[in-house]
Structure formats: structure tokens, C-alpha cells
Amino acid sequence: MVPPRWGSLDSLKPQQHLPMTKKGILLAAFGSGNRQGESTLRLFDERVRERFPGVPVRWAFTSVIMRRRLAAARKKTDSVLKALQKMWFEKYTHVAVQSLHIIPGAEYGDLVADVEAMRRDDGFTAATVGAPLLAGSGDMERSAAALLAHLPAGRKPDEAVVFMGHGTRHPAESSYEALAALVRRVDPHVHIGTMGGSRTLDHILPELQQGGVKGVWLMPLLSVVGRHATEDMAGTDPESWKSRLEASGLRCIPVLRGTAEYEGFVDIWLDHLTAAVSALDD
């Protein structure tokens, strides 16, 4: 190629530059206000940075109550929309948002709506969403395998395992039932219930009594350990799951570890994020 001569019109033409691409990742969790939960999210953050070196990672909490509670403790956190707006202001063009929710319920729907809003009106060039833990049949099978792989090692033959999820009136509540059905095919003494869904401890207690079990390992089906796990599940209040199980004559052993503390579950979320990051280039 012959360089333009001095004084030629070619030398005055503006250079054509492709728009700069700036990628980022936003991790969206329900929220956490205790050390264990914060440690769990920090370890998840490290796994994400290992898989996507050089890609900035931000956080958002989807729970309004959790954000207010943290604000009262002078800990600033962002909603999904606020975090996305900050990333847009910082000139990010491609953003992958990963949900750390268990099911695609109402909060996940709000997250998707926030991302969609930032796609419109001269927003991001591309914005994608990574699915929650139980988003499809493949996820169900992998989650069932992870759940069974992480059952307590010290469990005895006469002991059941009961997992407590959050629960919702959203149609995605059926995700818990689908997971429970897969697990029961392998181990009929593993039960999955929720605090406020269609299958609660009221439904599980008679099954435990009829099954002849003597003890129960109680585990949260929640991303991180927070008040639901420490109080609603394993607390001393008469209405906690632990208290009710003990009142029915069953010995109860709580295990306070969230699903984001187990590699088998974390790998599913990371694979969803990988798909979301790859889709940014489509």
C-alpha cells in the first residue's frame, strides 16, 4: 500500500476505528449479612475470576430487605439495576449477569427485566443473563447428583436428610418438586421442602414418621447461610424446623452450609455464566 502524498485528500480522511469493547460480569445474589455468607460469596467471586481472568466482576443483591439491613449497618450494596447503570456509566459495552438464585422465580424475573431495560434506549451493546441453579432438565439431573454427592458422611441407616428451600407462589416452585422426584429415585429418605411453597415441613413430617427414621439431618437448599438457615431452619424458636422435628421425637442434626459452598452446585452456576459470556459475542 502506497502511503498518501502530502497534501492529498486521502491524508485528510478520518481514520475508521471499530468501537471499543469493554466486557464485565455482574453476579446477582439474594444477599448476605453474616460472615459465613460473605465468605461464601467471596469464594464464588474467586472461582469466577479464575475462569474469566482479566474480566472485571461486580456484585448486586436482589433482596430489598437485605439491602436495607446492610445499609442500616453502613454497608453499601447495589440493586441489579443500580449496578448495571454504574457499569454503563463506566463505559462497559458487554455485560453478562449471573443469577445465584436456586429457581427462576420472581426475583430472577425482576433481574431479567432489569437487564432487558438496559439493552434498550442506547444501553449496552450486549447484555446476557446466566440461568439460576434449577433452570432446565439438565440442571435438575446435575443438581440431583450434586445433592446426593454432598449428603452427610456420618449419616446412619435410620436417618433421613431434609433440605429446606425458600419457597414461592411463583410457578417455578415446581422446580423443587422436580428435583425432589429425581433424588427420591435414588434415596427415598432424602426430602426437599420449602418454607412457604407447596411442600412444607407439614407434608414431610408424616412421611418421616411412616418411614421409621429415628433422626434427621437438616440442610439448607439456599445459596448462602443467612437468617433463614440459622433461625427458620436451625433456630431455637418452637416453630423452627429443628424444634418441630425434635418435638415429634426425632433427633435432629443441622448442617449450616449453603449450596454455593459445594463444588458440585458451583460448577453448574459457572457453566451457566460461561454460556452467558459466550453469548455476548453472538
UniProtKB/Swiss-Prot annotation:
Pathway: Cofactor biosynthesis; adenosylcobalamin biosynthesis; cob(II)yrinate a,c-diamide from sirohydrochlorin (anaerobic route): step 1/10; Porphyrin-containing compound metabolism; siroheme biosynthesis; siroheme from sirohydrochlorin: step 1/1. It is found in: Cytoplasm. The active site is at H166 (proton acceptor). GO terms for molecular function: metal ion binding; sirohydrochlorin cobaltochelatase activity; sirohydrochlorin ferrochelatase activity. Gene3D superfamilies: 3.40.50.1400. Its EC number is 4.99.1.3, 4.99.1.4. It is an enzyme of class 4 (lyase). Keywords: Cobalamin biosynthesis, Cobalt, Cytoplasm, Lyase, Metal-binding, Porphyrin biosynthesis. Signal peptide: none annotated. One of its GO terms (cellular component) is cytoplasm. It catalyses: Co-sirohydrochlorin + 2 H(+) = sirohydrochlorin + Co(2+); siroheme + 2 H(+) = sirohydrochlorin + Fe(2+). Co(2+) binds at H166, H228. GO terms for biological process: anaerobic cobalamin biosynthetic process; siroheme biosynthetic process. Pfam families: CbiK. Desulfovibrio vulgaris possesses two versions of CbiK encoded within the genome, one cytoplasmic (CbiKC) and one periplasmic (CbiKP). Belongs to the CbiK family. Catalyzes the insertion of Co(2+) into sirohydrochlorin as part of the anaerobic pathway to cobalamin biosynthesis. To a lesser extent, is also able to insert Fe(2+) into sirohydrochlorin, yielding siroheme. This is Sirohydrochlorin cobaltochelatase CbiKC.
